[in-house]
Curated annotation (Swiss-Prot):
Stated name of the protein: 42.8 kDa protein in whiE locus
Residue spans of biased composition, Low complexity class: 8-22
Region (Disordered): 1-22
Gene source species: Streptomyces coelicolor (strain ATCC BAA-471 / A3(2) / M145)
SUPFAM superfamilies, per the entry: Dimeric alpha+beta barrel
Domain of life: Bacteria
Length: 397
């Protein structure tokens, strides 16, 4: 179980929404090869640690509210157990830990409307929350064998957290939306001694916006810091009339619901062997997904990127897969012209192209032919590239 954090961000929120939990039947994506720093598909169990600051005097109300919702949470697919604890030293500090079969069912739950409705009774009792999410690597329990197969090796990363937000604007307002999102004043990148906003990349396709952020340190802290910046607040307010989903940023519940529905977590990130003199270009790809095929396509792209990370000569320097429901976006840093290597840039090289045919609705973007054909891949790349609006990096990132 988890409770949504206090909503505030450059384009706030944390983590995912409803994803079909396919991990039980799909093979795990290897992560012990170099380069993979994020993977929701490695098959390991997940431990969620939620720290809560409860209003003093409302401890009993909080406990009663938890009692009312605990059975509903226990029935969520993929949920294994949870444990509610109160601090020995400070009665306002509580800890809620939960275990999940894997990341996929947790991400399907944490930012869904169902989750918000379930935990709403707790909200009035809680001043603040902070959520931490971990893959279980090893477990020791009195000599009894631990369930599941542990990952053979830890992932190695660069202390960078990646997250994305997606939303749609009313048809006919795309030009003004693009102008607002291209011209806003950059927020102060420095958050505190351990957290810094590194990069914000915005893209548009039709009336859909995708905003991807990279943070060194704590994501929630950075997003809250950014949300307080006057320039960011001004552009968020200016966007309100154009949004297809109404929101009131002055109403915490309205803001929380908007950013919950907009959250699109990074489910896989791979960095490839860097090359000096590489001509980096960043692009975002919005894949046309058949109904219900989003989870399988995200897993396929993750598997392709994990395999490609072993190739030091490929054109892709880094790739991040963002996923929610049937929305799959892949953020790719490429060395050179992307159209020189469409299969690799799309993540549909080798067997991946044939495997993707049943998952992609290429005709929806005006592309005929099989993804296994080179000409089809070239056309597909041109049609699913999102239009870049802005790509801002902080000094030293």
């Amino acid at each position: 179980m988890t409770v949504s954090p206090v909503v505030a961000t450059d384009a706030p929120s944390t983590d995912a929404t409803r994803t079909t939990a396919t991990s039980a039947t799909s093979p795990a994506v290897a992560t012990d090869a170099g380069g993979v720093s994020i993977s929701a598909f490695d098959g390991s169990r997940v431990r969620v640690v939620l720290m809560l600051d409860v209003h003093d005097g409302m401890q009993q109300e909080f406990l009663d509210a938890y009692e009312r919702i605990r059975d509903r949470v226990a029935a969520v697919p993929g949920h294994v157990s949870d444990q509610l604890c109160q601090s020995l030293e400070n009665p306002t500090q509580w800890l809620l830990t939960s275990e999940w079969e894997s990341a996929a069912p947790f991400l399907a739950w944490v930012n869904s409307d169902e989750h918000l409705d379930t935990v709403e009774p707790l909200a009035t009792c809680v001043r603040d929350t902070h959520s931490l999410r971990y893959s279980v690597l090893r477990e020791t329990d009195g000599g009894r064998p631990a369930p599941g197969e542990p990952r053979s090796a830890p992932r190695i990363g660069d202390n960078v957290v990646r997250h994305a937000l997606t939303f749609t604007v009313r048809p006919g307002t795309e030009a003004e939306t693009a102008r607002l999102l291209s011209e806003y004043v950059s927020p102060d990148a420095h958050v505190d001694g351990s957290t810094r906003l590194l990069r914000t990349s915005l893209f548009m396709s039709g009336n859909r916006i995708v905003r991807a952020v990279e943070v060194r340190g704590d994501l929630q802290t950075a997003l809250r810091h950014v949300a307080r910046q006057p320039g960011v607040r001004a552009v968020e307010e200016a966007l309100n009339p154009y949004l297809e989903q109404d929101r009131d940023l002055g109403d915490p519940q309205s803001a929380r619901r908007f950013f919950t529905r907009a959250a699109m977590p990074a489910v896989h990130h791979a960095t490839y062997p860097d090359r000096s003199g590489a001509r980096r270009e960043r692009l975002a790809l919005l894949y046309p997904v058949r109904d219900g095929a989003g989870p399988d396509l995200a897993r396929l792209l993750a598997r392709q990127d994990a395999a490609a990370a072993r190739n030091p000569d490929g054109p892709v320097l880094a790739a991040t897969v963002f996923h929610r429901d049937d929305l799959v976006v892949r953020l790719v840093d490429v060395d050179g012209d992307p159209e020189d290597a469409p299969a690799e840039v799309l993540g549909l090289h080798g067997r991946g192209a044939a495997d993707a045919e049943r998952l992609l609705d290429a005709a929806a973007v005006g592309v005929d032919g099989s993804p296994a054909e080179a000409a089809t891949l070239s056309r597909l790349l041109r049609r699913i590239r999102m239009t870049p609006l802005t790509d801002r990096r902080s000094a030293g990132s």
